[in-house]
């Protein structure tokens, strides 16, 4: 009976049904209430994060005293100049949101007149 007990103990941890203790630390689970994207490039605000933009780049900060997590998301632009300048807001005393869109630059140069 000692041999069966000994062979049962020699089975590596990855062959067991239970995950090893360190595997959960390697892949942290996503927080369920950060930010969810809806159609049209508009972001809905959920608990812990604030952010909304139509086209361009959005910087989103959550209220946290540890490390501020920043999400940079590029959304296809729906038109020229939908968002101009920057938008900032404070919610809960610690959250800030800003967004900006670069103006559209024409790809073709000036057309020369036939007289030139």
Curated annotation (Swiss-Prot):
Keyword annotations of the record: Dwarfism, Glycoprotein, Membrane, Transmembrane, Transmembrane helix
Biased composition (Basic and acidic residues): 1-28
TM region(s), chain numbering: 40-60, 78-98
Regions annotated as coiled coil: none
InterPro entries: UPF0444
Location within or outside the cell: Membrane
Domain of life: Eukaryota
Family (UniProt): Belongs to the TMEM263 family.
Purpose of the protein: May be involved in the growth pathway.
Disease: Defect in TMEM263 may be a one of the causes of autosomal recessive dwarfism in Cornell K-strain white leghorns. A nonsense mutation truncates the protein and probably cause a dysfunctional protein. Autosomal dwarf chicken display small body stature by short shank length, with 30-40% reduced adult body weight despite normal hormonal concentration of GH and IGF1.
Name of the protein in question: Transmembrane protein 263
Gene name of this polypeptide: TMEM263
């Amino acid at each position: 009976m000692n041999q069966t007990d000994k062979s049962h103990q020699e089975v590596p941890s990855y062959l067991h049904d239970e995950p090893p203790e360190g595997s959960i630390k390697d892949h942290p689970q996503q927080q369920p209430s950060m930010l969810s994207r809806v159609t049209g490039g508009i972001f809905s605000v959920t608990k812990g994060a604030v952010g909304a933009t139509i086209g361009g780049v959005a910087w989103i900060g959550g209220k946290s005293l540890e490390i501020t997590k920043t999400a940079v998301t590029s959304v296809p632009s729906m038109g020229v100049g939908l968002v101009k300048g920057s938008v900032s807001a404070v919610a809960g005393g610690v959250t800030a949101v800003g967004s900006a869109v670069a103006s559209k630059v024409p790809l073709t140069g000036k057309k020369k007149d036939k007289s030139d």
